[in-house]
Amino acid sequence: METALSAEALTVTRSGQTVLKDVSFSVSAGDVYALLGGNGAGKSTTLLTFLGFLSPDSGTAKVLGESVAANLKTIRQSTAYLPEAATLYQHLNAYENLDYFLSLAKVRADRAAIDAALDRVSLQADARSNRLSTYSKGMRQKVAIALALLRDTPILLLDEPTSGLDPVAIDEFNTLVRSLAEEGRSILMVTHDVYGACQVADRIGLLRNGELVGAFDRPESGQIDTEAVHAAFAGRSAA
């Protein structure tokens, strides 16, 4: 199976502190890989390295087999990034925000395509013409997710994508992620949500203090064992 993303012995230092230490993993095309860890584990640093915003001290980050450092422009055209706190304009409505940010990315999308993306993230039709200042945090997150979908890239990089969503919206999002993978998109998401990661991921990598300390694969039927992952996350053995 083709490899969409790979980290090869990545070591990254920020402000004099080593935040990733010899990290290696790969994401197969059409798979969901969840990088799980607590605050300060190095999750967001990993995403920023794949985006080329950070340069590794050693090792290589590759997208579609190409080094990020050597092919930055092409690689950014192949990836859509959803930051934990997406920048959206509160005085604009959902349509206006999406039109504006898509124009910056030089992506064309008509109203039907935008409505289809907002349908996929379950944003109520009657709210789409309202200013984002009237939205809940979860509703704003849905607009940000729709923007990532409209980029229509083969790879999605998601930083704590369910932050601010209620339990129903989280389940809807996880269903969406699985459907995107089934359509062939490759997804790297970072999260501290053990349950959500087990529900949606084909593979989980566990980061602790910048080191990859565990890996879990989805069985042929069902999902990754939540109890085993939770035990590893907490630093103890599963019962």
Indicate where each model-derived feature is located.
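Hydrophobic anchor residue at the start of the ABC signature
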Residues: 145
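The feature captures the beta-strand-to-loop junction immediately N-terminal to the Walker
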Residues: 36-38
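Catalytic Walker B motif of ABC-type/P-loop ATPase nucleotide-binding domains
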Residues: 156-159
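H-loop/switch region of ABC-family ATPase nucleotide-binding domains
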Residues: 191-192
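Conserved ABC ATPase "signature" region
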Residues: 99, 103, 111-127
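Conserved ABC transporter NBD signature motif
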Residues: 59-70, 75
